[in-house]
Amino acid sequence: MAGILCLCGMMRLLTALFIPVLIASIGLCLVLVLLFICTRLWIQRKKKQSVEIGKDGKKKRVVAFFHPYCNAGGGGERVLWCALRSLQKRYKDAIYVIYTGDKDVSEEQILNGAAARFNIKLSHPVKFIFLEKRGLVEASFYPRFTLLGQSLGSVVLGWEALTKCVPDIYIDSMGYAFTLPLFKYVGGCQVGCYVHYPTISMDMLSVVRSQNARFNNAAFISNNPVLSRLKLIYYYLFAVIYGWVGSCSDVIMVNSTWTFAHILDLWKCSERTSIVYPPCDVQTFLDINLNQHKDIEEHSIVSIGQFRPEKDHPLQICAFAALLKKKTTEKLKLKLILIGGCRNNEDELRVSELKKLSSELGIPVEFKVNIPFAELKKHLSEATIGLHTMWNEHFGIGIVECMAAGTIILAHNSGGPKLDIVVPYEEHETGFLADSVESYAAAMDYILCLTPEQRLTIRQNARRSVARFSDQEFEANFLASSEPLFM
Protein backbone atom coordinates (compact mmCIF):
# COMPACT_ATOMS: atom_id res chain seq x y z
CA MET A 1 0.00 0.00 0.00
CA ALA A 2 2.82 2.38 0.91
CA GLY A 3 4.47 1.64 -2.43
CA ILE A 4 1.30 2.57 -4.33
CA LEU A 5 1.02 5.84 -2.39
CA CYS A 6 4.66 6.64 -3.13
CA LEU A 7 4.12 5.96 -6.85
CA CYS A 8 1.04 8.18 -6.89
CA GLY A 9 2.98 10.94 -5.19
CA MET A 10 5.73 10.66 -7.77
CA MET A 11 3.20 10.88 -10.62
CA ARG A 12 1.61 14.00 -9.10
CA LEU A 13 5.06 15.60 -8.79
CA LEU A 14 5.92 14.84 -12.42
CA THR A 15 2.54 16.17 -13.56
CA ALA A 16 3.06 19.36 -11.57
CA LEU A 17 6.54 19.83 -13.09
CA PHE A 18 5.50 19.07 -16.68
CA ILE A 19 4.01 22.46 -17.53
CA PRO A 20 6.85 24.56 -15.99
CA VAL A 21 9.47 22.41 -17.76
CA LEU A 22 7.55 22.67 -21.05
CA ILE A 23 7.33 26.46 -20.72
CA ALA A 24 11.04 26.70 -19.87
CA SER A 25 11.95 24.52 -22.88
CA ILE A 26 9.83 26.60 -25.26
CA GLY A 27 11.34 29.77 -23.81
CA LEU A 28 14.87 28.44 -24.27
CA CYS A 29 14.12 27.47 -27.89
CA LEU A 30 12.72 30.95 -28.58
CA VAL A 31 15.82 32.56 -27.07
CA LEU A 32 18.09 30.39 -29.23
CA VAL A 33 16.08 31.16 -32.38
CA LEU A 34 16.15 34.88 -31.58
CA LEU A 35 19.90 34.71 -30.93
CA PHE A 36 20.43 32.94 -34.27
CA ILE A 37 18.35 35.53 -36.16
CA CYS A 38 20.16 38.45 -34.50
CA THR A 39 23.58 36.89 -35.19
CA ARG A 40 22.73 36.26 -38.83
CA LEU A 41 21.41 39.83 -39.30
CA TRP A 42 24.60 41.20 -37.72
CA ILE A 43 26.78 39.08 -40.02
CA GLN A 44 24.80 40.16 -43.09
CA ARG A 45 25.18 43.82 -42.11
CA LYS A 46 28.96 43.32 -41.86
CA LYS A 47 28.87 41.72 -45.29
CA LYS A 48 27.03 44.68 -46.86
CA GLN A 49 29.47 47.14 -45.31
CA SER A 50 32.43 45.43 -47.01
CA VAL A 51 30.93 45.14 -50.50
CA GLU A 52 33.21 46.18 -53.38
CA ILE A 53 31.84 47.29 -56.76
CA GLY A 54 33.57 46.24 -59.98
CA LYS A 55 34.16 48.28 -63.13
CA ASP A 56 30.92 46.94 -64.61
CA GLY A 57 28.94 48.32 -61.67
CA LYS A 58 28.24 44.87 -60.25
CA LYS A 59 29.13 43.67 -56.77
CA LYS A 60 32.35 41.68 -56.66
CA ARG A 61 31.98 38.18 -55.29
CA VAL A 62 34.22 37.20 -52.41
CA VAL A 63 35.57 33.64 -52.62
CA ALA A 64 37.20 32.41 -49.42
CA PHE A 65 39.29 29.30 -48.77
CA PHE A 66 39.57 27.99 -45.21
CA HIS A 67 43.11 26.62 -44.95
CA PRO A 68 44.70 27.34 -41.52
CA TYR A 69 48.02 25.78 -42.60
CA CYS A 70 48.36 27.30 -46.07
CA ASN A 71 52.14 27.73 -45.66
CA ALA A 72 52.74 24.00 -45.11
CA GLY A 73 54.36 22.08 -47.92
CA GLY A 74 52.05 19.10 -48.35
CA GLY A 75 49.73 17.84 -51.05
CA GLY A 76 46.76 19.61 -49.47
CA GLU A 77 48.48 22.95 -49.98
CA ARG A 78 49.17 22.12 -53.61
CA VAL A 79 45.42 21.55 -54.05
CA LEU A 80 44.75 24.97 -52.48
CA TRP A 81 47.09 26.89 -54.77
CA CYS A 82 46.03 25.05 -57.93
CA ALA A 83 42.35 25.55 -57.06
CA LEU A 84 42.96 29.27 -56.52
CA ARG A 85 44.85 29.55 -59.79
CA SER A 86 42.08 27.81 -61.74
CA LEU A 87 39.32 29.99 -60.25
CA GLN A 88 41.30 33.17 -60.91
CA LYS A 89 41.56 32.20 -64.57
CA ARG A 90 37.79 31.60 -64.86
CA TYR A 91 36.38 34.26 -62.49
CA LYS A 92 38.79 37.15 -62.92
CA ASP A 93 36.62 39.80 -61.22
CA ALA A 94 36.17 37.97 -57.93
CA ILE A 95 38.01 38.81 -54.71
CA TYR A 96 39.97 35.85 -53.33
CA VAL A 97 40.62 35.30 -49.63
CA ILE A 98 42.55 32.69 -47.65
CA TYR A 99 41.84 32.22 -43.94
CA THR A 100 45.15 31.12 -42.40
CA GLY A 101 46.78 30.78 -39.02
CA ASP A 102 50.33 31.27 -40.32
CA LYS A 103 50.94 34.49 -38.37
CA ASP A 104 54.71 34.05 -38.25
CA VAL A 105 55.14 34.76 -41.98
CA SER A 106 54.11 37.59 -44.28
CA GLU A 107 51.78 37.38 -47.28
CA GLU A 108 54.76 37.73 -49.60
CA GLN A 109 56.60 34.88 -47.88
CA ILE A 110 53.57 32.60 -48.22
CA LEU A 111 53.24 33.32 -51.95
CA ASN A 112 56.99 32.91 -52.49
CA GLY A 113 56.85 29.62 -50.61
CA ALA A 114 54.09 28.33 -52.88
CA ALA A 115 56.15 29.30 -55.93
CA ALA A 116 59.31 27.65 -54.57
CA ARG A 117 57.71 24.42 -53.35
CA PHE A 118 55.02 23.84 -55.95
CA ASN A 119 56.13 25.94 -58.90
CA ILE A 120 52.78 27.80 -58.72
CA LYS A 121 52.32 31.54 -59.20
CA LEU A 122 48.93 33.26 -59.02
CA SER A 123 47.88 35.65 -61.77
CA HIS A 124 45.77 37.88 -59.48
CA PRO A 125 46.11 39.15 -55.89
CA VAL A 126 44.86 37.15 -52.93
CA LYS A 127 43.96 38.56 -49.53
CA PHE A 128 45.08 36.76 -46.38
CA ILE A 129 42.98 36.82 -43.21
CA PHE A 130 45.29 35.87 -40.35
CA LEU A 131 43.57 33.95 -37.55
CA GLU A 132 44.63 34.11 -33.90
CA LYS A 133 43.05 30.91 -32.58
CA ARG A 134 44.65 28.23 -34.77
CA GLY A 135 45.93 26.48 -31.66
CA LEU A 136 42.36 25.27 -31.09
CA VAL A 137 42.66 22.87 -34.03
CA GLU A 138 46.05 21.46 -32.99
CA ALA A 139 45.87 17.78 -32.02
CA SER A 140 48.32 18.40 -29.17
CA PHE A 141 45.74 20.69 -27.54
CA TYR A 142 43.45 17.70 -26.94
CA PRO A 143 45.21 14.70 -25.34
CA ARG A 144 41.82 12.96 -25.11
CA PHE A 145 38.72 13.21 -27.35
CA THR A 146 40.96 14.66 -30.04
CA LEU A 147 38.45 14.37 -32.90
CA LEU A 148 35.71 16.14 -30.97
CA GLY A 149 38.07 18.76 -29.56
CA GLN A 150 39.57 19.67 -32.93
CA SER A 151 36.14 19.76 -34.56
CA LEU A 152 34.66 22.08 -31.94
CA GLY A 153 37.86 24.12 -32.04
CA SER A 154 37.42 24.51 -35.80
CA VAL A 155 33.97 26.03 -35.18
CA VAL A 156 35.53 28.67 -32.91
CA LEU A 157 38.27 29.29 -35.49
CA GLY A 158 35.63 29.44 -38.22
CA TRP A 159 33.66 32.00 -36.22
CA GLU A 160 36.77 34.17 -35.97
CA ALA A 161 37.20 33.86 -39.74
CA LEU A 162 33.55 34.69 -40.44
CA THR A 163 33.57 37.80 -38.26
CA LYS A 164 36.72 39.08 -39.98
CA CYS A 165 35.47 38.52 -43.53
CA VAL A 166 32.03 37.36 -44.72
CA PRO A 167 32.40 35.73 -48.15
CA ASP A 168 29.83 34.93 -50.80
CA ILE A 169 31.41 31.56 -51.51
CA TYR A 170 33.17 29.53 -48.84
CA ILE A 171 35.39 26.54 -49.63
CA ASP A 172 36.87 24.36 -46.90
CA SER A 173 40.01 22.93 -48.49
CA MET A 174 41.51 21.32 -45.40
CA GLY A 175 38.86 19.04 -43.95
CA TYR A 176 37.20 21.16 -41.27
CA ALA A 177 33.64 20.02 -42.03
CA PHE A 178 32.23 21.47 -38.79
CA THR A 179 32.70 24.97 -40.25
CA LEU A 180 30.31 24.24 -43.14
CA PRO A 181 26.97 24.78 -41.31
CA LEU A 182 28.42 27.89 -39.65
CA PHE A 183 29.18 29.59 -42.96
CA LYS A 184 26.03 28.28 -44.65
CA TYR A 185 23.38 29.07 -42.05
CA VAL A 186 24.96 31.93 -40.08
CA GLY A 187 27.07 33.45 -42.86
CA GLY A 188 24.51 32.88 -45.61
CA CYS A 189 27.25 31.62 -47.97
CA GLN A 190 27.33 29.09 -50.74
CA VAL A 191 29.58 26.40 -49.27
CA GLY A 192 31.78 23.79 -50.86
CA CYS A 193 34.56 21.51 -49.68
CA TYR A 194 37.46 19.48 -50.98
CA VAL A 195 37.87 16.40 -48.79
CA HIS A 196 41.35 14.90 -48.61
CA TYR A 197 40.53 12.46 -45.84
CA PRO A 198 37.34 11.92 -43.81
CA THR A 199 37.73 13.01 -40.19
CA ILE A 200 36.33 9.63 -39.20
CA SER A 201 35.89 6.55 -41.37
CA MET A 202 34.40 3.08 -41.24
CA ASP A 203 37.96 1.74 -41.10
CA MET A 204 38.61 3.68 -37.89
CA LEU A 205 35.49 2.15 -36.36
CA SER A 206 36.72 -1.29 -37.42
CA VAL A 207 40.11 -0.70 -35.77
CA VAL A 208 38.45 0.13 -32.44
CA ARG A 209 35.90 -2.68 -32.77
CA SER A 210 38.64 -5.25 -33.37
CA GLN A 211 40.78 -3.73 -30.56
CA ASN A 212 43.84 -3.10 -32.76
CA ALA A 213 46.49 -0.64 -31.55
CA ARG A 214 47.33 2.10 -34.08
CA PHE A 215 48.47 5.73 -33.96
CA ASN A 216 44.83 6.81 -33.34
CA ASN A 217 43.97 3.94 -30.98
CA ALA A 218 46.24 3.81 -27.93
CA ALA A 219 47.33 0.41 -26.60
CA PHE A 220 45.75 0.99 -23.17
CA ILE A 221 42.37 1.39 -24.91
CA SER A 222 42.79 -1.49 -27.37
CA ASN A 223 43.76 -3.79 -24.48
CA ASN A 224 40.66 -2.90 -22.43
CA PRO A 225 37.27 -4.21 -23.68
CA VAL A 226 35.28 -1.66 -21.65
CA LEU A 227 37.30 1.33 -22.88
CA SER A 228 37.14 -0.03 -26.44
CA ARG A 229 33.34 -0.24 -26.20
CA LEU A 230 33.09 3.31 -24.83
CA LYS A 231 35.38 4.62 -27.57
CA LEU A 232 33.30 2.79 -30.17
CA ILE A 233 30.13 4.52 -28.89
CA TYR A 234 31.97 7.86 -28.98
CA TYR A 235 33.09 7.22 -32.56
CA TYR A 236 29.58 6.24 -33.69
CA LEU A 237 28.05 9.37 -32.16
CA PHE A 238 30.77 11.51 -33.73
CA ALA A 239 30.20 9.83 -37.11
CA VAL A 240 26.49 10.76 -36.97
CA ILE A 241 27.29 14.42 -36.24
CA TYR A 242 30.06 14.43 -38.87
CA GLY A 243 27.59 13.08 -41.40
CA TRP A 244 25.15 15.92 -40.70
CA VAL A 245 27.70 18.78 -40.89
CA GLY A 246 29.18 17.36 -44.08
CA SER A 247 25.77 17.09 -45.72
CA CYS A 248 25.41 20.87 -45.36
CA SER A 249 27.87 21.36 -48.22
CA ASP A 250 26.41 22.47 -51.56
CA VAL A 251 29.36 21.00 -53.47
CA ILE A 252 31.52 18.10 -52.30
CA MET A 253 34.76 17.18 -54.02
CA VAL A 254 36.85 14.21 -52.91
CA ASN A 255 40.32 13.20 -53.97
CA SER A 256 40.08 9.46 -54.56
CA THR A 257 37.90 6.39 -54.93
CA TRP A 258 38.63 5.44 -51.32
CA THR A 259 37.58 8.83 -49.94
CA PHE A 260 34.52 8.86 -52.22
CA ALA A 261 33.25 5.56 -50.78
CA HIS A 262 33.70 6.68 -47.17
CA ILE A 263 32.16 10.11 -47.69
CA LEU A 264 29.11 8.55 -49.36
CA ASP A 265 28.74 6.21 -46.37
CA LEU A 266 28.88 9.10 -43.91
CA TRP A 267 27.42 12.14 -45.70
CA LYS A 268 24.99 10.35 -48.04
CA CYS A 269 25.05 13.09 -50.72
CA SER A 270 25.81 11.16 -53.91
CA GLU A 271 24.23 13.78 -56.20
CA ARG A 272 26.56 16.50 -54.87
CA THR A 273 29.75 14.45 -54.59
CA SER A 274 32.38 14.00 -57.28
CA ILE A 275 35.94 12.68 -57.51
CA VAL A 276 38.49 15.35 -58.42
CA TYR A 277 41.96 13.84 -58.38
CA PRO A 278 44.44 16.26 -56.79
CA PRO A 279 46.87 18.15 -59.04
CA CYS A 280 50.28 16.61 -59.44
CA ASP A 281 53.00 18.55 -61.21
CA VAL A 282 53.60 15.70 -63.62
CA GLN A 283 54.87 17.96 -66.41
CA THR A 284 57.74 19.31 -64.32
CA PHE A 285 59.23 15.83 -63.89
CA LEU A 286 59.00 14.74 -67.52
CA ASP A 287 62.39 16.24 -68.39
CA ILE A 288 64.12 13.72 -66.13
CA ASN A 289 65.91 11.19 -68.32
CA LEU A 290 64.80 7.69 -67.36
CA ASN A 291 67.88 6.11 -68.95
CA GLN A 292 70.23 7.86 -66.51
CA HIS A 293 69.39 5.19 -63.92
CA LYS A 294 71.07 2.46 -65.94
CA ASP A 295 74.52 2.21 -64.38
CA ILE A 296 74.38 3.88 -60.98
CA GLU A 297 76.75 2.89 -58.17
CA GLU A 298 74.55 4.00 -55.26
CA HIS A 299 70.80 3.36 -55.02
CA SER A 300 68.79 5.93 -53.10
CA ILE A 301 65.36 5.18 -51.66
CA VAL A 302 63.31 8.36 -51.31
CA SER A 303 60.17 9.07 -49.29
CA ILE A 304 58.00 12.19 -49.75
CA GLY A 305 55.43 13.17 -47.12
CA GLN A 306 54.84 15.51 -44.22
CA PHE A 307 56.25 14.33 -40.90
CA ARG A 308 52.89 13.38 -39.41
CA PRO A 309 52.24 10.23 -37.33
CA GLU A 310 49.92 8.63 -39.90
CA LYS A 311 52.68 8.70 -42.53
CA ASP A 312 54.39 5.94 -40.50
CA HIS A 313 58.01 6.92 -41.13
CA PRO A 314 59.20 4.41 -38.46
CA LEU A 315 57.97 1.62 -40.77
CA GLN A 316 60.18 3.01 -43.55
CA ILE A 317 63.24 3.10 -41.30
CA CYS A 318 62.64 -0.40 -39.92
CA ALA A 319 62.00 -1.82 -43.40
CA PHE A 320 65.24 -0.24 -44.66
CA ALA A 321 67.10 -1.76 -41.71
CA ALA A 322 65.62 -5.17 -42.60
CA LEU A 323 66.67 -4.68 -46.24
CA LEU A 324 70.28 -4.01 -45.25
CA LYS A 325 70.40 -7.39 -43.47
CA LYS A 326 69.62 -9.30 -46.66
CA LYS A 327 72.57 -11.02 -48.35
CA THR A 328 71.54 -9.84 -51.80
CA THR A 329 72.13 -6.22 -50.80
CA GLU A 330 75.51 -6.68 -49.10
CA LYS A 331 77.45 -5.45 -52.15
CA LEU A 332 75.07 -2.57 -52.93
CA LYS A 333 75.47 1.01 -51.75
CA LEU A 334 72.09 2.07 -50.38
CA LYS A 335 70.75 5.17 -48.66
CA LEU A 336 67.33 6.24 -47.39
CA ILE A 337 66.23 9.87 -47.82
CA LEU A 338 63.13 11.13 -45.99
CA ILE A 339 61.76 14.35 -47.52
CA GLY A 340 58.87 16.18 -45.89
CA GLY A 341 57.38 19.29 -44.37
CA CYS A 342 57.12 20.22 -40.69
CA ARG A 343 54.03 22.24 -39.73
CA ASN A 344 54.81 22.85 -36.06
CA ASN A 345 56.95 21.93 -33.04
CA GLU A 346 55.17 18.59 -32.76
CA ASP A 347 56.32 17.61 -36.26
CA GLU A 348 59.87 18.79 -35.52
CA LEU A 349 59.92 16.66 -32.38
CA ARG A 350 58.78 13.72 -34.48
CA VAL A 351 61.75 14.22 -36.82
CA SER A 352 64.07 14.16 -33.81
CA GLU A 353 62.53 10.85 -32.70
CA LEU A 354 63.00 9.41 -36.20
CA LYS A 355 66.66 10.45 -36.19
CA LYS A 356 67.04 8.75 -32.82
CA LEU A 357 65.44 5.56 -34.18
CA SER A 358 67.74 5.45 -37.23
CA SER A 359 70.74 6.02 -34.96
CA GLU A 360 69.68 3.17 -32.66
CA LEU A 361 69.34 0.85 -35.66
CA GLY A 362 72.69 2.05 -37.00
CA ILE A 363 71.46 2.81 -40.51
CA PRO A 364 72.20 5.78 -42.82
CA VAL A 365 69.13 8.01 -43.14
CA GLU A 366 69.10 11.55 -44.53
CA PHE A 367 66.36 13.99 -43.47
CA LYS A 368 65.36 16.82 -45.81
CA VAL A 369 62.86 19.12 -44.08
CA ASN A 370 60.91 21.89 -45.87
CA ILE A 371 63.25 21.84 -48.85
CA PRO A 372 62.56 23.87 -52.03
CA PHE A 373 61.06 22.25 -55.11
CA ALA A 374 64.34 22.27 -57.08
CA GLU A 375 66.07 20.18 -54.42
CA LEU A 376 63.10 17.81 -54.21
CA LYS A 377 63.27 17.25 -57.96
CA LYS A 378 67.01 16.57 -57.81
CA HIS A 379 66.58 13.84 -55.20
CA LEU A 380 63.78 12.21 -57.18
CA SER A 381 65.82 12.28 -60.38
CA GLU A 382 68.57 10.29 -58.64
CA ALA A 383 66.33 7.82 -56.77
CA THR A 384 65.79 4.18 -57.63
CA ILE A 385 62.80 3.55 -55.32
CA GLY A 386 60.04 5.87 -54.11
CA LEU A 387 58.78 4.75 -50.69
CA HIS A 388 55.33 5.29 -49.15
CA THR A 389 54.00 3.65 -45.96
CA MET A 390 50.78 5.38 -44.86
CA TRP A 391 47.89 3.03 -44.15
CA ASN A 392 44.73 4.06 -46.02
CA GLU A 393 46.35 7.12 -47.60
CA HIS A 394 43.50 9.11 -49.13
CA PHE A 395 45.42 9.64 -52.37
CA GLY A 396 49.17 10.25 -52.41
CA ILE A 397 50.49 13.15 -54.49
CA GLY A 398 54.02 12.21 -53.49
CA ILE A 399 53.48 8.78 -55.03
CA VAL A 400 52.44 10.29 -58.37
CA GLU A 401 55.44 12.64 -58.32
CA CYS A 402 57.75 9.69 -57.70
CA MET A 403 56.25 7.79 -60.63
CA ALA A 404 56.44 10.81 -62.95
CA ALA A 405 60.08 11.37 -61.96
CA GLY A 406 60.97 7.80 -62.87
CA THR A 407 61.38 6.14 -59.49
CA ILE A 408 59.91 2.70 -58.97
CA ILE A 409 57.17 3.22 -56.42
CA LEU A 410 56.64 0.96 -53.42
CA ALA A 411 53.44 2.06 -51.66
CA HIS A 412 51.14 0.82 -48.91
CA ASN A 413 48.66 -1.80 -50.04
CA SER A 414 45.56 0.20 -49.08
CA GLY A 415 43.52 3.33 -49.81
CA GLY A 416 44.16 5.54 -52.82
CA PRO A 417 47.53 4.02 -53.81
CA LYS A 418 45.93 0.60 -54.13
CA LEU A 419 42.67 1.72 -55.80
CA ASP A 420 43.72 4.66 -57.98
CA ILE A 421 47.47 5.02 -58.48
CA VAL A 422 49.61 1.88 -58.35
CA VAL A 423 47.37 -0.03 -60.74
CA PRO A 424 48.22 -1.75 -64.04
CA TYR A 425 48.46 0.55 -67.05
CA GLU A 426 47.44 -1.13 -70.29
CA GLU A 427 47.89 -4.41 -68.40
CA HIS A 428 51.51 -3.59 -67.49
CA GLU A 429 53.09 -3.21 -64.04
CA THR A 430 53.51 0.35 -62.71
CA GLY A 431 54.85 -0.28 -59.20
CA PHE A 432 54.61 -2.42 -56.08
CA LEU A 433 52.55 -2.61 -52.87
CA ALA A 434 53.40 -3.82 -49.35
CA ASP A 435 52.01 -3.60 -45.81
CA SER A 436 54.62 -4.76 -43.27
CA VAL A 437 58.33 -4.49 -42.46
CA GLU A 438 58.96 -7.89 -44.04
CA SER A 439 56.95 -7.28 -47.21
CA TYR A 440 58.50 -3.83 -47.73
CA ALA A 441 62.01 -5.21 -47.30
CA ALA A 442 61.24 -8.09 -49.66
CA ALA A 443 59.77 -5.76 -52.30
CA MET A 444 62.77 -3.39 -52.15
CA ASP A 445 65.09 -6.37 -52.43
CA TYR A 446 63.16 -7.61 -55.49
CA ILE A 447 63.30 -4.19 -57.18
CA LEU A 448 67.04 -3.87 -56.59
CA CYS A 449 67.61 -7.35 -58.06
CA LEU A 450 65.85 -6.46 -61.32
CA THR A 451 68.00 -5.69 -64.34
CA PRO A 452 68.27 -2.02 -65.39
CA GLU A 453 66.17 -2.87 -68.47
CA GLN A 454 63.39 -4.40 -66.35
CA ARG A 455 63.35 -1.37 -64.05
CA LEU A 456 63.25 0.95 -67.07
CA THR A 457 60.14 -0.80 -68.43
CA ILE A 458 58.31 -0.32 -65.12
CA ARG A 459 59.39 3.34 -64.97
CA GLN A 460 58.09 4.00 -68.46
CA ASN A 461 54.73 2.35 -67.71
CA ALA A 462 54.40 4.34 -64.48
CA ARG A 463 55.20 7.66 -66.13
CA ARG A 464 52.62 7.12 -68.86
CA SER A 465 49.97 6.10 -66.31
CA VAL A 466 50.11 9.30 -64.22
CA ALA A 467 49.11 11.69 -67.02
CA ARG A 468 45.56 11.50 -65.64
CA PHE A 469 46.74 13.30 -62.48
CA SER A 470 48.14 16.41 -64.19
CA ASP A 471 47.46 20.03 -63.22
CA GLN A 472 45.41 20.47 -66.38
CA GLU A 473 43.10 17.56 -65.53
CA PHE A 474 42.63 18.90 -62.00
CA GLU A 475 41.78 22.42 -63.17
CA ALA A 476 39.17 21.18 -65.64
CA ASN A 477 37.52 18.86 -63.11
CA PHE A 478 37.69 21.36 -60.22
CA LEU A 479 36.05 24.11 -62.29
CA ALA A 480 33.31 21.76 -63.50
CA SER A 481 32.55 20.51 -59.98
CA SER A 482 32.62 23.94 -58.28
CA GLU A 483 30.52 25.67 -60.95
CA PRO A 484 27.22 25.33 -58.98
CA LEU A 485 28.71 27.59 -56.29
CA PHE A 486 29.00 30.44 -58.80
CA MET A 487 25.56 30.12 -60.41
UniProtKB/Swiss-Prot annotation:
Membrane topology term reads: Single-pass membrane protein
State its location(s). Answer: Endoplasmic reticulum membrane
Q: Which reaction does it catalyse?
A: an alpha-D-Man-(1->3)-[alpha-D-Man-(1->6)]-beta-D-Man-(1->4)-beta-D-GlcNAc-(1->4)-alpha-D-GlcNAc-diphospho-di-trans,poly-cis-dolichol + 2 GDP-alpha-D-mannose = an alpha-D-Man-(1->2)-alpha-D-Man-(1->2)-alpha-D-Man-(1->3)-[alpha-D-Man-(1->6)]-beta-D-Man-(1->4)-beta-D-GlcNAc-(1->4)-alpha-D-GlcNAc-diphospho-di-trans,poly-cis-dolichol + 2 GDP + 2 H(+)
In terms of one coarse class, where is the protein primarily found?
endoplasmic reticulum
Q: Which GO terms describe its cellular component?
A: endoplasmic reticulum membrane
E.C. number(s) listed in UniProt: 2.4.1.131
Q: Which domain of life is it from?
A: Eukaryota
Q: Which residues lie within the membrane without crossing it?
A: 232-252, 395-415
Cytoplasmic topological domain: 38-231, 253-394, 416-487
**Pathway recorded for this protein:** Protein modification; protein glycosylation
Keywords of the record, alphabetical order, are: Endoplasmic reticulum, Glycosyltransferase, Membrane, Transferase, Transmembrane, Transmembrane helix
User: What task does this protein carry out?
Assistant: GDP-Man:Man(3)GlcNAc(2)-PP-Dol alpha-1,2-mannosyltransferase that operates in the biosynthetic pathway of dolichol-linked oligosaccharides, the glycan precursors employed in protein asparagine (N)-glycosylation. The assembly of dolichol-linked oligosaccharides begins on the cytosolic side of the endoplasmic reticulum membrane and finishes in its lumen. The sequential addition of sugars to dolichol pyrophosphate produces dolichol-linked oligosaccharides containing fourteen sugars, including two GlcNAcs, nine mannoses and three glucoses.
Family to which the UniProt record says this protein belongs:
Belongs to the glycosyltransferase group 1 family. Glycosyltransferase 4 subfamily.
Q: What is this protein called?
A: GDP-Man:Man(3)GlcNAc(2)-PP-Dol alpha-1,2-mannosyltransferase
Report the source organism: Xenopus tropicalis (Western clawed frog)
Gene designation per UniProt:
alg11
